[in-house]
A protein has these predicted regions:
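FAD-binding subdomain of flavoenzyme oxidoreductases
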Residues: 1-114, 339-349, 353-362
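C-terminal substrate-recognition/cap domain of FAD-linked oxidoreductases
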Residues: 55-61, 65-284, 293-295, 299-300, ...
Length: 362
């Protein structure tokens, strides 16, 4: 597959073979249901849920690679692929923002994005506590300035934001970071710009290693990635995150969890640790999954931004998109794979019962 101009598409559709049939059927599917697909598409910057039918045809280019990418091997097999890469900037500085109150989060994220950070990450107070507990001797002395700063600004932060700014020179990267910090001064929150790559590394280490700390340091519990990739519009974060935390609160004695992710996108990764040998604890998973995904959908988000559906999220696609759009996913599967050979029970045909039957119990 490759992007096709309109005249190339017409040529493909004239083919009297399986490939020609795919192009004819998919063209009819997306053009006849264009309004439905447009309305169903979540208003977020990343979305891996379902089939990306809305990306195939823009009126000028017909591109089935955008459908095949992210289809989890359910439509066929990729034997060769070509990637376009970019050359990263040589220098970077990190703007670190400590939030004691989530109320201004939406405005802070929006204001930071106007300065075009290269990356914009975050982690919550649970992540920071975990790092302080298990990485204390590695980083304790390096965090003395931050400890003093946050103590003066109301104590332990609820959320830490990491905005990375890059440039072709050290001075360019530093100027971008300082300009952004100056632009955020009105929010009256603790923040600082890293002095060097080594200074920034302690923050990245917490973001990067939090999952490994959970897995290796907390005994008797296993990872349970059932709501590990949610995304909502960034402008709703101030309201969404407190509601999300409230859903987990009743189960705080049955799980350990952290929330980290990409603040600029509103994309968060939650991977609880739970004692999966307990039937009572296992019963929490479908109940909490239902509640979290209902909340995400209510805020106009997606149940998966990056990690895709698999057997865990496929049963929730009708809830997210509605029966009509889900029927188009089923039709797409039949067009490409009429015998249901490729990776069944993903994207379509999955049930909660099937997913739960594959849950670890030890």
């Amino acid at each position: 597959f490759r992007p096709l101009l309109a005249f190339e598409l017409r040529k493909k559709m004239r083919q009297a073979d399986f490939e020609g049939g795919i192009y004819r059927d998919m063209y009819c599917l997306v053009t006849e249901n264009a309004a439905l697909l447009k309305a169903a598409r979540p208003t977020v910057s990343k979305n891996s849920a379902g089939y990306a039918l809305w990306d195939i045809w823009d009126g000028k280019i017909f591109d089935l690679t955008k459908l095949f990418t992210g289809s989890q091997g359910t439509l066929g097999m990729i034997t060769e692929i070509e990637f376009k890469t970019i050359r990263p900037k040589k220098h970077s500085r990190l703007l670190v923002i400590f939030l004691n109150d989530l109320a201004p989060l939406c405005d802070i994220v929006a204001a930071t994005l106007t300065h075009h950070p290269e990356s914009f990450e975050s982690y919550d107070n649970h992540t920071l506590w975990l790092a302080m507990r298990y990485m204390l001797f590695r980083f304790a002395w390096q965090f003395i300035p931050e400890i003093v700063m946050v103590a003066r600004n109301g104590g332990f932060p609820q959320l830490v934001l990491l905005a990375e700014f890059t440039g072709d020179s050290k001075s360019e990267a530093l100027l971008k970071a300082r300009t952004a910090m100056h632009g955020l001064a009105r929010f009256k929150c603790a923040m600082r710009v890293s002095n060097s790559a080594k200074d920034a590394e302690k923050y990245w280490a917490i973001r990067r290693e939090s999952f490994n700390l959970l897995r290796t340091k907390i005994k008797g519990r296993q990872t349970a990635p059932f709501v590990d990739d949610i995304i909502v519009p960034p402008e709703s974060l101030s309201q969404f995150l407190p509601e999300l935390n409230a859903l987990f609160t009743p189960y705080k004695n049955d799980m350990t969890y952290t929330i980290a992710g990409h603040a600029g996108n509103g994309n968060f990764h939650i991977i609880p640790l739970m004692d999966l040998s307990s039937a009572r604890v296992r019963r929490i998973i479908p109940m909490l999954t239902d509640a979290v995904y209902a909340l995400v959908i209510r805020y106009g988000g997606s149940i998966t931004a990056e990690h895709n559906d698999g057997i865990v999220r496929t049963p929730y696609l009708p809830q997210m998109y509605g029966a009509e759009v889900y029927a188009l996913f089923e039709k797409t599967k039949r067009i490409f794979d009429p015998q249901n050979i490729f990776n069944p029970h993903k994207k379509v045909g999955g049930t909660k019962e099937y997913a739960l039957s594959h849950m670890r119990t030890e």
